[in-house]
Amino acid sequence: MLDKVIRIISFFRILILLTTFSPLVHAASLDSADIERFLEQSSWGPTYASTQYCQQLGSFENCLQEQFNASPSLYPLIVAAPQRSIQLCPKGSPAICFRDNYTQYPNQVIFFNNALAGSDQLRQRVAFALHQIFVVSGVKITQPSYMVPYLNILLKDAFGNYRDLLKDITLNPAMGHYLDMVNNDKTNTAGTINPNENYAREVMQLFTIGLNWLNPDGTLIFDHQNQPIPTYNQDTVEGFAHVFTGWTYANPSTSLASKFPNSLNFADSMVLFRDKKGVDTHHDKGLKMLLSLSPNGAPITLPAKQDGQVDFEAALDNLFNHSNVGPFIGKQLIQHLVTSNPSPAYINRVSTAFNTGRSNGFGTGNRGDMQALIAAILLDIDARGALKTEVNYGHLREPAQFVLNILRTSNAQSDGILNQLTTLMGQNIFNSPTVFNYYPHSYMIPGTLVDGPEFGIDTSIAAIARENFINSLVFSKINVTGSVGTSINFSQLNTLAANPLDLINTLDQVFLHSTMDQNMRTQLLTIINSISAKNPLLRSQTAVYLVLTSNQYQVQR
């Protein structure tokens, strides 16, 4: 049998509808395989229409520009439910009452529908990557209404500037609640209240600079004892924690807060509380130590008695202008979109684009320009061109990408109720178990020195779940109460099944972008020929199942 890769899911609840299976058309002016690889990196999977359109545009730069210009498909605002679920969903209420108002289910359905059919594919893909860097989780932010503004920030700022994204996320109430910045108070005279350090630590470790000083190519900088040099210490954490004091929920639709702590409001950005005289009475007024500008440099300090807004902007500037941001964030976005193990040269080129704000004709020339950063990642020589055959190139398709790629590429019909599938594979969308994402970005494949972040959730259970998903999608029709379902139609493939080589060539083109190796092709041919030509459906189903469960498909290259 064909090699089975990595994991493949338990999908016991999907109703199957009919749709048309549309093979992708190879491009003429651009390299066909590269167009399809480009769309796998820049969208949730190539479709017949997207492949044709990119081909017609004539260049990857034009394809990128079209996506940069596409209007965002945002999450619709949801009216906040009462804090206590018993008020809205008393005992005896249908289960969907709690599901729709006190879980991330509504946002999950929107996510999958936008990923499957949204015209802003690149924005959707980048926003999800940013969500895995700036993690906010429904494990703590349970109401879907609370999460919507955060999700829309990721979409709106995906093509803007990283400094704006950093500010918008920092002042988002869902983030404020998740990492305890909202209602973070200054030290009181009795010493019983001290500024919370949670957001201060994570904004450095996860959202901007990482733990150790980096060269522009992402490699570590070492001290004279050949040890990595930390980017910050406890004094730095305390300095930022004191900066982030005095912020609370805004009064609805205003930039003011009437009290501290103020009443819950997840719809508007947090504000700095000021008393009737305009004084920020809950902001710490002491001297604050921030980050140094070089590995051996003295830390930047904020003077005492500054206004809280001034401290806040200066602290974000200090973070944003740190030399680590380009390689630290750039590498993570490369890992999400292209390959888990980018070369130092690749990271350096992407880092340069972040620093200069320009790449391949994109960008404003301002540091942190996201369009320049994205263009540098997707148009780089390490992303484009001939198929990359290095053993450590590419990345395991994370569950969301695995499911969505298959459905988009096969032109599936779906209602977007798909989160139960990815959850079984280890990725419960918008419910990351910790602030460190669904899987750690630094995860190495056991027994190797190769980064493989997505393998961090690639357990034996997840592997079985992936296989069960493919098995159910290809061979079964499983009814789900209240769900339209998801399905593909094999009618077109069935017409090819009489000639196994035609069937194999089509699947190679559709799913593997004409890169199927000879060993896999030979094994497929043997297996298909072992099935009677009088049963074209079984031939088609078996071939699709074997291709999608192969290691050649599981790893996006």
Predicted regions and their residues:
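Eukaryotic PEST-like, Ser/Thr/Pro-rich intrinsically disordered regions enriched for SP/TP/PP repeats
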Residues: A27-A28, S59
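N-terminal secretory signal peptides that target proteins for export/translocation
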Residues: M1-S10
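N-terminal, post-signal peptide beta-strand-biased segments of exported outer-membrane/organellar beta-barrel
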Residues: A33-D34, Y48
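Flexible, low-complexity segments enriched for small/polar residues
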Residues: A28-L30, E36-S43, H322-G326, G330-M370, ...
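Generic alpha-helical secondary-structure signal
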Residues: F38, C63-E66, D168, F240, ...
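Active-site substrate-binding loop specific to GH73 endo-beta-N-acetylglucosaminidase modules
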Residues: Q55, P90-A95, R99, Q104-F112, ...
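Bacterial N-terminal signal peptides
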Residues: F11-P23
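N-terminal accessory alpha/beta regions
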Residues: Y48-D157, V182, S255
